[in-house]
């Protein structure tokens, strides 16, 4: 079965994730079928946090690929950027 999930890259304490279509039996960071985008949780300045190729994502889901829970959240955020801004506001209010 094909799964759409995150594959970790980057350096120690500086994570960077690729959104990939891969066989569910493979290890998290092993070879994948296709890279569909990326997610950088630690952005600075003008760096782009999230990129997803929606056409390819739709293609793989039409072929029966299962999407992981975290990637579902990221797709929602990608389609509606206000979700991310709201989450940041809530987290900063809790830290006060």
From Swiss-Prot:
Among InterPro entries, the record links this protein to:
Ribosomal_bS16, Ribosomal_bS16_CS, Ribosomal_bS16_dom_sf
> Keywords, A to Z?
Ribonucleoprotein, Ribosomal protein
Could you state one GO biological process linked to this protein? Answer: translation
The molecular function terms of the Gene Ontology recorded here are: structural constituent of ribosome
One Gene Ontology term, aspect cellular component:
cytoplasm
Annotated membrane-spanning segments are: none
Identify its protein family: Belongs to the bacterial ribosomal protein bS16 family.
Q: What protein name applies here?
A: Small ribosomal subunit protein bS16
Q: Which organism is it from?
A: Vesicomyosocius okutanii subsp. Calyptogena okutanii (strain HA)
Per the UniProt record, the lineage of the source organism begins with: Bacteria, Pseudomonadati, Pseudomonadota, Gammaproteobacteria, Candidatus Pseudothioglobaceae
């Amino acid at each position: 079965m094909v799964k759409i999930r995150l594959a970790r890259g980057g350096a120690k304490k500086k994570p960077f994730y690729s959104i990939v279509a891969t066989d569910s039996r493979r290890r998290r960071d092993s070879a994948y079928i296709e890279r569909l985008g990326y997610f950088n949780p630690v952005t600075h300045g003008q760096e782009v946090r999230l990129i997803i190729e929606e056409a390819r994502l739709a293609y793989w889901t039409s072929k029966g690929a299962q999407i992981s829970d975290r990637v579902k959240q990221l797709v929602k955020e990608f389609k509606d950027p206000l979700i991310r801004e709201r989450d940041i506001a809530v987290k900063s209010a809790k830290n006060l």
